UniProtKB/Swiss-Prot annotation:
Gene Ontology annotations of biological process type: alkaloid metabolic process
Gene: COR1.1
Residues the entry annotates as binding NADPH: 27, 51, 187, 214, 216, 264, 269
Residue positions binding substrate: 119
Chief place where the protein resides: cytoplasm
SS bond partners: none
Pathway terms, separated by semicolons: Alkaloid biosynthesis; morphine biosynthesis
Protein's job: NADPH-dependent reductase involved in biosynthesis of morphinan-type benzylisoquinoline and opiate alkaloids natural products. Reduces codeinone to codeine in the penultimate step in morphine biosynthesis. Can use morphinone, hydrocodone and hydromorphone as substrate during reductive reaction with NADPH as cofactor, and morphine and dihydrocodeine as substrate during oxidative reaction with NADP as cofactor. Converts morphinone to morphine, and neomorphinone to neomorphine.
Top-level taxonomy: Eukaryota, Viridiplantae, Streptophyta, Embryophyta, Tracheophyta
SUPFAM superfamilies: NAD(P)-linked oxidoreductase (SSF51430)
List of catalytic residues: 56 (proton donor), 119 (proton donor)
EC primary class: oxidoreductase
Identification of the protein by name: NADPH-dependent codeinone reductase 1-1
Length: 321
């Protein structure tokens, strides 16, 4: 366990990852001094795992915060941090993977990533990131060649580990049929209102660590919901345990054997979110949470197309829960 109280998880490749990370997807203060200062404050209060992506456009601010943290002595070396970034869909082509990773490293001012993830199981026509994706730009991903390029990035030392995001059991199976090295992480939405039972069981059987995002319902995001934070069940448990609803939700995810990333730019909540590892939910608590109605928060609508690989949400997520 780290000095900040966050347990370390050993991934199937052997590298160790903090069980809790700070998410960096933010629209309101993207690319601002406030964003950089929030990352710097997170390092100061004890966060050592940061989750970014080319699409978040937060890599440069995070890189500046890391450089400043080193200068201020908040950390002694870059090796104290675990940095994750993600390959955007327009770069999910065999010849573009390495250049995309190298661009992320330039943004972050780093020599290597700890974890590099494919952001979605879809490719787009090559080009700059755009908020509104033309439907005819959505393409099926060549899992074999793209994953081989991800493996090459790891072999070259630009990332210590590789994985995926938002992959269903079916997509994972397709990828692993030709992979030399299986993904070590699958980052997906998971919370008390989306248990992901089938996917969790599949990933566990294949030594893939689930990293949960939208653990608190992605409140504030365009697709966000108050279903988690306003849950009466979670509120009752929180009162009984002397914890916050956020802490109960995060603790539930951790007790399912998953790692997680959460985001807050508020210092008090940053500190609160770290305090989920020295207590447990009871069997009765877990039973109550198991009965919470289930619904997905995140949407794949922007990656659906009549001519693309996925035409409906159900097809994209391959949901059986």
């Amino acid at each position: 366990m780290e000095s900040n109280g966050v347990p370390m998880i050993t991934l199937s490749s052997g590298i160790r990852m903090p069980a809790l990370g700070m998410g960096t997807a933010e629209t309101m203060v993207k690319g601002t001094e406030r964003e950089k200062l929030a990352f710097l404050k997170a390092i100061e209060v004890g966060y050592r795992h940061f989750d970014t992506a080319a699409a978040y456009q937060s890599e440069e601010c995070l890189g500046e915060a890391i450089a400043e943290a080193l200068q201020l002595g908040l950390i002694k070396s870059r090796d104290e941090l675990f940095i994750t970034s993600k390959l955007w869909c327009a770069d999910a082509h065999a010849d573009l993977v390495l250049p995309a990773l190298q661009n992320s490293l330039r943004n972050l001012k780093l020599d290597y990533l700890d974890l590099y993830l494919i952001h979605h199981p879809v490719s787009l026509k090559p080009g700059k990131f755009v908020n509104e994706i033309p439907k005819d730009h959505i393409l099926p991903m060549d899992y074999k060649s793209v994953w081989a390029a991800m493996e090459e990035c790891q072999t070259l030392g630009f990332t210590r580990a590789i994985g995926v995001c938002n992959f269903s059991c079916k997509r994972l199976q397709e990828l692993m049929e030709t992979a030399n090295s299986p993904p070590v992480v699958n980052q997906v939405e998971m919370s008390p209102t989306l248990h992901q039972k089938n996917l969790r069981e599949y990933c566990k059987a294949n030594n893939i660590m689930i990293t949960a995002h939208s653990v608190l319902g992605a409140v504030g995001a365009a697709w966000g919901t108050n279903a988690v934070m306003h849950s009466k069940v979670l509120h009752q448990i929180a009162v009984a345990r002397g914890k916050s609803v956020a802490q109960v939700s995060m603790r539930w995810v951790y007790q399912q054997g998953a790692s997680l990333v959460v985001k807050s730019f508020n210092e008090a909540r940053m500190k609160e979110n770290l305090k989920i590892f020295d207590w447990e939910l009871t069997a009765e608590d877990m039973e109550k949470i198991s009965e919470i109605p289930q619904s997905r928060t995140s949407s794949a609508a922007f990656l659906l197309s009549p001519t693309g690989p996925f035409k409906t949400e159900e097809e994209f997520w391959d949901e059986k829960d």
